[in-house]
Amino acid sequence: MAEVTAAQVKELRERTGAGMMDCKKALNEVGGNMDKAIDFLREKGLAAAAKKEGRIAAEGIVEAYIHGGGRIGVMLELNCETDFVANTDGFKQFARDIALQIAAAKPRYLAKADVPEEELEHEKNILRAQALNEGKPEKIVDKMVEGRISKFYKEVCLLEQEFVKDPDKTINDLVLEKTAKIGERIVIRRFTRYEMGEGIERREEDFAAEVMKEMNR
């Protein structure tokens, strides 16, 4: 039987919201088959997020966050299934936390799939050139690039970013946790971030660091 990889466990966790050990056990039980592992977790009542994937999340709120007298602004649409959940303090606080994350960490895209192919290829070409300039053997360069591109995703994709308040979790982890806890599908649909003077040459001011301090109070 093929050995279950960490990447498989991570993917199963992202798709189901189940714990790491439960995901590893499920994959071992079914010989590494992802679909069968999801079914295994559902049968055990452990795949909270997977059971809700097909449900429509059309309610929710638009959260607006303004920092530092109007120097940074964020608008975020966070969806759920019912207006009851949308009006709870917990859901509103979650939207606030995500808006603060966007203000502090400056993501440009929501998910990996949103990164334009030409930008991704451009980044890979730069990483490939860097590896070659470091004197790395050409036969391992592509593997190195794939490893380094994951860091790029963590910088530019909101769902891949480490949560500023708890770096052991990604934003995607938080969404899955909230889905399991609330019992409804939760979706970050879209966001926009503005920073005063963005694109204009001016003296350096780290507004994002200020937001991080506010989040950790």
Curated annotation (Swiss-Prot):
Family matches, as PROSITE patterns: EF_TS_1 (PS01126), EF_TS_2 (PS01127)
Major location (coarse): cytoplasm
InterPro entries recorded: EF-Ts_dimer_sf, Transl_elong_EFTs/EF1B, Transl_elong_EFTs/EF1B_dimer, Transl_elong_Ts_CS, UBA-like_sf
Subcellular location: Cytoplasm
GO MF annotations, alphabetized: translation elongation factor activity
Alphabetical list of Pfam families matching this protein: EF_TS (PF00889)
Region of interest called Involved in Mg(2+) ion dislocation from EF-Tu, as start-end residue ranges on this chain: 82-85
SUPFAM superfamilies, A to Z: Elongation factor Ts (EF-Ts), dimerisation domain (SSF54713), UBA-like (SSF46934)
UniProt entry keywords in alphabetical sequence: Cytoplasm, Elongation factor, Protein biosynthesis
Alphabetical list of Gene3D superfamilies matching this protein: 1.10.286.20, DNA helicase RuvA subunit, C-terminal domain, Elongation factor Ts, dimerisation domain
Example of a GO cellular component annotation carried by this entry: cytoplasm
Job of this protein: Associates with the EF-Tu.GDP complex and induces the exchange of GDP to GTP. It remains bound to the aminoacyl-tRNA.EF-Tu.GTP complex up to the GTP hydrolysis stage on the ribosome.
Similarity comment: Belongs to the EF-Ts family.
HAMAP family: EF_Ts
Name of the protein described by the UniProt record: Elongation factor Ts
Organism: Desulfitobacterium hafniense (strain Y51)
